[in-house]
C-alpha cells in the first residue's frame, strides 16, 4: 500500500483486502508511539477481525510490537510455553506447571505472561503466590534464567507502549488480534514455543508466523475449546518445523491417558491454584497431572523439533516429563526459581 493512513488501511480491510506486513507494522508503530487515537485503534482492530487476519498481517503487528519492546537476550536454546487465554474455562494453571516440568527435564524456559484477564488466576498471579518475584528488571530476569534455567518476563515491564491500546481494547470488550500477540512477542524471542490458542481460526495463522520466523513450535487447541492440549477429548495440533506447517489431530487415549471431565481441570482463586501446583509437584496422581504432563511433553517436543510421528515423539517426552516430577526434580526446580528470584530482588 503506497499511502499509509488510517483511513486507507481501515478502508482496505472493510473492502476485504489484506494488508502487507509493512502496513500492519506501520499501524502498530502508530499505536505504540501514542500517535493513534482510540477510535483509530478500535476501528482498525475490529475491521481486521471482521476481515480475518492473515499470516503477513499478524507477523507485521508482532514485529511492530517487538520494535517497541524491551527485549532481552538469554543464552542458548530457549522455550516458551503459554496459552493465549480467552477460553473462559477457568482451568488450573496448566502451562505454568508444564513450564516448571519442562525446565526440570532440561529445557531453558523463558515464560512471558501477565495477570489474569479472562480467568480467576493468571500465570503471574499464581507464580507470585508461590513465591516467585515476577517483576524483576530485565537483567535480573536473564540472570535467573542462566542460574536455574527458568525465568518469567512480566509483560507490562517489557511492553510498556501497549498501554496506548488498553482503553479501546477494554471498551471494545471483544477479542481482537491483540489477544493473540502475547505468545508472538516474548521479549526473549525464544527458539521454540508451545502455544495454546482458544480460537481455531488463529491457530494456523500463528503457526504460519512461527514458520516464517524459522522457529520450531507446536500450536494447539483442545477440541473442547481449551487453549491447551486437553484430556477431555481430542486436540488439534499445528506442527511447525523447518519452516513448514503440518496439521494433526491428537487423541490423548493413544498415549494411555484417560478421559477427564472439564470439572476435574477447573481452577479457582489464586490460593486454590497455588495449592494445586504444590500438590502436583508433590506427585499427586489424577487428571491435573495427566494434563500437565501432556502439555509439558508438547513443549519438550517443540524444543527438539517434531519431524517424525507426533504421537511417538509425545510418548517419549511424556515419560521424560513424568520422570521430572516423580524424581522430585520439578519440585526442586520451583524451589530454586523462588530462591533465585528472591535473591535478585533483595539486591535491588
From Swiss-Prot:
Mg(2+) 2 binds at residues 227-228. Keywords: Amino-acid biosynthesis, Aromatic amino acid biosynthesis, Glycosyltransferase, Magnesium, Metal-binding, Transferase, Tryptophan biosynthesis. Binds 2 magnesium ions per monomer. One of its GO terms (molecular function) is anthranilate phosphoribosyltransferase activity. 5-phospho-alpha-D-ribose 1-diphosphate binds at residues 83, 86-87, 91, 93-96, 111-119, 123. Pathway: Amino-acid biosynthesis; L-tryptophan biosynthesis; L-tryptophan from chorismate: step 2/5. Anthranilate 2 binds at residue 169. Its EC number is 2.4.2.18. One of its GO terms (cellular component) is cytosol. One of its GO terms (biological process) is L-tryptophan biosynthetic process. Pfam families: Glycos_trans_3N (PF02885), Glycos_transf_3 (PF00591). Mg(2+) 1 binds at residues 95, 228. Its cofactor is Mg(2+). InterPro entries: Anthranilate_Pribosyl_Tfrase (IPR005940), Glycosyl_Trfase_fam3 (IPR000312), Glycosyl_Trfase_fam3_N_dom (IPR017459), Glycosyl_Trfase_fam3_N_dom_sf (IPR036320), Nuc_phospho_transferase (IPR035902). It catalyses: N-(5-phospho-beta-D-ribosyl)anthranilate + diphosphate = 5-phospho-alpha-D-ribose 1-diphosphate + anthranilate. It comes from the Bacteria. Anthranilate 1 binds at residues 83, 114. HAMAP family: TrpD. Catalyzes the transfer of the phosphoribosyl group of 5-phosphorylribose-1-pyrophosphate (PRPP) to anthranilate to yield N-(5'-phosphoribosyl)-anthranilate (PRA). Homodimer. Belongs to the anthranilate phosphoribosyltransferase family. This is Anthranilate phosphoribosyltransferase. The lineage of its organism: Bacteria, Bacillati, Actinomycetota, Actinomycetes, Streptosporangiales.
